[in-house]
Amino acid sequence: MAHKKAGGSSRNGRDSAGRRLGVKKFGSEAVIPGNIIVRQRGTKWHPGTNVGMGKDHTLFALVPGKVQFETRRGRDFVTVVPLAQAAE
């Protein structure tokens, strides 16, 4: 009798899609209110002046202006310099 032994099932072959995290607007780029600046897990970057933080730690602009990255007290902050000041 021609029988074929049952094939084993593989335990590999699956992976999750990338989460598209990272910096979306870099230093000195122009932003408008609501623009996402950084998507992150945890607070690698902290919100500075004129920057808000969502419940998933996403940083976003609160005013129109230019993005600025800076380090204060050993932490990395993202701030938005308002257009009036950025023009000066």
From Swiss-Prot:
Q: What is this protein called?
A: Large ribosomal subunit protein bL27
Region Disordered, annotated ranges: 1-23
Protein family according to the UniProt entry: Belongs to the bacterial ribosomal protein bL27 family.
Q: Which Gene3D superfamilies match?
A: 2.40.50.100
Annotated organism of origin:
Methylorubrum extorquens (strain PA1)
Would you tell me the Gene Ontology cellular component terms?
A: cytosolic large ribosomal subunit
Annotated GO molecular function terms are: structural constituent of ribosome
Q: Which GO terms describe its biological process?
A: translation
> InterPro entries recorded for this chain?
Ribosomal_bL27, Ribosomal_bL27_CS
User: Lineage of this protein's species?
Assistant: Bacteria, Pseudomonadati, Pseudomonadota, Alphaproteobacteria, Hyphomicrobiales
Q: Which UniProt keywords apply?
A: Ribonucleoprotein, Ribosomal protein
